[in-house]
Amino acid sequence: MELGMFRLNIYQPGGPIGALYPVEKILYHGRSQYQEIMILVLRGFGKTLVLDGLIQSTESDEHIYHETLVHPAMTVHPNPRRVLILGGGEGATLREVLKHNTVEKAVMVDIDGEVVRVAREYLPEWHQGAFDDPRAQVVIMDGFEYIKEAARRGEDFDVIIMDLTDPFGPKIAAKLYTKEAIGLVKSVLRSDGILVTQAGCAALFPEAFEKVYGSVKSLFAHAEEYGVWVPSFMYVNSFVFASDKYRLTDLSMEEVDRRLRERGVETRFYSGLRHYTLIGLGGIRLLEGRGS
């Protein structure tokens, strides 16, 4: 990687569709056991985490993605005390979870300890000390194996957040999007728990999205799509919310804002109004007559 232009290929590294980003500085470039890791400074976006040639998050808009991933599920649940995060090596998902004063324990499991190490050193704006919060437990382990062990131990969680690399992207997280894996995830979710997973982009990658959505829908009473435009990704990032008890629309805009206030949660993007905007923006299935 040299100073100049960074080419982001939306579909895959080396793919036919992409965009050029001016690179102002290379802060880190290395390779772990699992993937290539770069921390770049991109003009207009600031610090940027790139894994295997795909942008994961940028300083300018990571809060949009992470607040959208975390807070709908955390806010709809009336008392999220135990939370499991699969992936999320930058620590920003953990940061957002810990904003809720109901949380007693948050376990973050990431297979790549090198990503976590690099994030600790180069991305303090992301984790903001979350790794060292006494409520946080960081586990460097394959998420699939962790879930199996947690099930054997009889552990359970109120909210489980899957913050993995894209289902259409690198293969590192592919097995955690399968029906078998989602079934294991549900086995450590309390009966009134909520699962949320990022799911790529339903509009650009419908086959990958439908695989994720189908796996979730087959196992939960309710599965709902929502989404948010992430400028650095150049697309609407899709998410899937699932529960046997709760739905995204269970709370009014006013109730969302009230819960955020009561829990001491401060956000830059997410709010009661945005909660419903996210549901509308993620309505690809609804527009095509395939709603949940």
From Swiss-Prot:
It catalyses: norspermine + S-adenosyl 3-(methylsulfanyl)propylamine = caldopentamine + S-methyl-5'-thioadenosine + 2 H(+); norspermidine + S-adenosyl 3-(methylsulfanyl)propylamine = norspermine + S-methyl-5'-thioadenosine + H(+); S-adenosyl 3-(methylsulfanyl)propylamine + spermidine = thermospermine + S-methyl-5'-thioadenosine + H(+). GO terms for biological process: polyamine biosynthetic process; spermidine biosynthetic process. GO terms for molecular function: spermidine synthase activity; sym-norspermidine synthase activity; thermospermine synthase activity. CDD domains: AdoMet_MTases (cd02440). The keyword Transferase applies. Pfam families: Spermine_synt_N, Spermine_synth. It is found in: Cytoplasm. The keyword Cytoplasm applies. The active site is at D163 (proton acceptor). InterPro entries: PABS, PABS_CS, SAM-dependent_MTases_sf, Spermi_synthase, Spermidine_synt_N, Spermidine_synt_N_sf. S-methyl-5'-thioadenosine binds at Q35, D110, D142, G143. Homodimer or homotetramer. Belongs to the spermidine/spermine synthase family. Involved in the biosynthesis of polyamines which are thought to support the growth of thermophilic microorganisms under high-temperature conditions. It seems that long-chain and branched-chain of polyamines effectively stabilize DNA and RNA, respectively. Catalyzes the irreversible transfer of a propylamine group from the amino donor S-adenosylmethioninamine (decarboxy-AdoMet) to norspermidine, spermidine and norspermine to yield norspermine, thermospermine and caldopentamine, respectively. This is Polyamine aminopropyltransferase 1.
